[in-house]
Amino acid sequence: MADEKSTGKRGHTSRRNFIAGTGLAAVSAPFYARSADNPSGDTRNCVDESERAKRIATAPKAPFDSIRDYMAALDAHGLLLRVPEIDQDEYQMTALMFRATDEYGFFESPAFMYDKVKIDGEWINGPVVGNFQGHVNTDCIAFGLEPDPHDIKVSYRRAKAHMNKLLDSTEDGRWPEIAPVELGRDEAPCKEITLSGDECDLTKFAFVKTNPADAGRYVNTGSVFTSDPELGNNFGTYRCEITGPRTLRINSEKNHAGYKMLLAARERGEKVGHVSIAVGQDPIIWLLSGAPLARQRGDGAVDELAIAGGMRGKALEVVKSDTSEMLVPAHAEMIIEGEVPLDAPLQTEGPFGEMFGYLGPQKQAVFWMNVTHITHRRDPWLMNSFTGMQRGYTTSPVEVLYERIMRRSIPNLIEFHYPQDMMGVSFVSIDKTAPGQGLEVGRTVANRVSICKVVVVVDADMDVLDRTQMLFTMGSRWQPDPATEIIPKGRGNITDPSSIVQGETSKIVIDATMQWPEEGGPANYAKRNRALLEELAPDALAQAHASFGEALRLWGKS
């Protein structure tokens, strides 16, 4: 993460210059307080920290019941850019997301709110929000922690410490649970407006076609709720292609619980599967919907709504679907209900721009859905995922869970990181205690985590969140022979564009730890210059920071 904007690398562009360069200077005023001392409206770098603190103090606090409260908190932290109108027929939303990533990277780009979007020649009222969990500081904000305004690595590790605390709070080391609370229909905000039958028309809402090569417009952030007598209730984020005013094609992969539930219902001879799709979710429901957190190997039925409550520290308010018994988040912006014809032929879906940043292939056989009922809040807020251009969700809970699982077989593991802007690459730090341990650890990680195609193992003195340190240690400590192992065939990610067989990949383990003499390394490994500075002049770094740190931080920000 350290190669992003916070370090001043990559020819840093100030937020003021970025806004001016994209033609948004006039539209950012509602969300960035300007002053003579802060003409850019950048609340993170504002000299007057009291104004920033005041905005944060008066903003909604976690646990957030709605996406509206959560976005208000992002705004208070200076992480939101509002655009009154944008032409998605010209793919301006998509282009702006790419531009933001060009300037700020995956980890420090703002969230966006588009009030009105041009789609298929018509201006449709939103708002539509994007990149809502892209910035690393959202890992703190979503869970009620205050991020460090100057160091995203500090923020990220603060969030990871909170996740470990949550897991430590239970006897079995799993996420805590608080059972949901069911509201009456008239109490649920998601039931403010009701559409039924022919009144339902998904094309009237601001669901967009994200990429020019995508198959069409998508509901690509919906939490798809399904139910099964053995597996229980489930919700997962499966993109849904809009193929008509009242039809959706549901891209749930064969390993997803939603697909397994619909398939099981068909095998039982059922003719119809009931589905409810929640759109505009609170940040914890969104996280659980898209991240591999709730279900671990060997789990049977899992109450994901209770896990959401446990992670929030407060029971989730739910309401019964109008056309089925499924419980859905009461504060969601929209609930799309419908029926999956289980006795009908499956349909094609896609193509769609995937998370590796490449166009994925068309799927040949997916379940599809007839939309029979829609309820929503007045003027619903919709979310759009710019897949492959942004960090999709807060990743600290996932990395902490992986670390705890892997420590069962790697007790000396220090930290694990798989950066979302380098899909397929992962970094692992260990407290090395024996020769051969680097390759052994890397092999374990590669076999356990399918997304890890390139596994780099480093010593304890290297920071896996610091991209520069990772490249430095590969250049200075790694000897390709013998500190490399190729795994010819392993479990891969199904969206990897380089895979010949979907879900399979070769892998490489790179042992970038200091090689011991028993491994063919030097008898006496030279010390790093920085380590010698810390050893021989132990006060130098602290003195430099105290005297010049603020000037260095502000350099290039105006």
Predicted regions and their residues:
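Extended, highly charged
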Residues: N45-W368, T372-S558
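Helix-centric, low-specificity signal for extended rod-like, repetitive segments
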Residues: G8-K9, D37, D48, G232
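N-terminal secretory signal peptides
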Residues: M1-S14, N38-G41
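Intrinsically disordered, low-complexity segments enriched in polar/charged small residues
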Residues: A20-G21, P39, G244
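N-terminal export leaders
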Residues: S14-T22, V27
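Boundary at the C-terminal end of the N-terminal hydrophobic targeting segment
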Residues: A33-S35
